[in-house]
Structures are given as structure tokens and as C-alpha cells.
Amino acid sequence: QAEGCSPIATAFKAGRDFFKPVKPKTIAKSLAIGNPADGYYALKATAESKGAMDAVTDEEVVEGIKLLAQTEGIFAETAGGVTIGVLCKLVKQGLIKKNDVTVAYITGNGLKTQEAVVDAVGRPFRIQPSLVNFQKTFKMGKNSGGES
């Protein structure tokens, strides 16, 4: 969950089987549910499966979005940034080993939440729709040392 709205992760870390509703404050709007209807079941399923759960800051959400874009070419929305951010956190904590097979479901695209990453990556720019313009722009990015 995003730290600005993490009632389930907070309860899990505290070892509780119930959560306290919160007022959401996060860039991950699609996950900003302060009183999740299935929160109890999420806690129960995580405990029964000996799973793990955590929360990430909005900055870590943006870093997750950037990491996925740079490594896989996927522009995820903020919920996907939460998924990747928490995945990275669980790896750092040793709860997921670097060689473990792990699947991260990223179902929303970043076009829905562009405003969340504008400060970190800059505003998108437009080119005229042609292969020549694309190739020229792509080459400029490579020559400037930018990621293309």
C-alpha cells in the first residue's frame, strides 16, 4: 500500500487482525481507500499464507514507476508503482530472495496518472506523426545520453 493510505499494511506490521480506517493522502489515487471493504480478508490471507506486506512513500511510488519504465519499457500508473516499490522493499528486507520467481501484476497504464511523475521525469513532448520524426527524436535522445 501507499504510506499515505496504508491501513492494512499498518495493521499487518503491528501484528493485528483488524485495521483502523485512515484518511487517504497519496498520489496513488486508485489505491486511496481509507476503509477497504476486504481489508480483513487481505490481512487473513497474508497471515495464513505466511506472506508479507508493506507500504511505500509517494517518492518510492515514483521510483517504482521509473524503474519499471527503464528496465521493462512499461509505463505503469501509480498503483503499479506501489507494487514495484513494495517488491523492491521486500527484496531489500530479504523477504523475497533475488533468485525467487516473482510475478508483479501491473494492470494500469501511466497515461492515467501522468501528473504523478511530471516532476520526476519532465513533461512529455510531441512530434509530428512520421517515422522520420520518430527516428530523429530517438537519435537525439541517444546522442544526449538520455534513455531511449
Located regions from the model:
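Glycine-rich phosphate/pyrophosphate-binding loop at beta-loop-alpha junctions
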Residues: Q1-E48, K112-T113, V117
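A generic, residue-level signal for flexible/boundary positions that often mark functional hotspots
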Residues: A2, S6, K25, A47-K50, ...
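Electropositive phosphate-/nucleotide-binding environments in soluble metabolic enzymes
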Residues: A2, S6, P21, K25, ...
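Short, low-complexity, polar/charged sequence segments that are solvent-exposed and flexible
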Residues: R16-K20, K50, E72-F75, G122-F125
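Phosphate-binding loop/pocket of nucleotide- and phosphate-handling active sites
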Residues: K20-K25, I84-S148
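Short glycine/serine/threonine-biased micro-segments
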Residues: A28, A32, T71, T78, ...
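Active-site-adjacent helical/loop segments in soluble small-molecule enzymes
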Residues: A37-K97
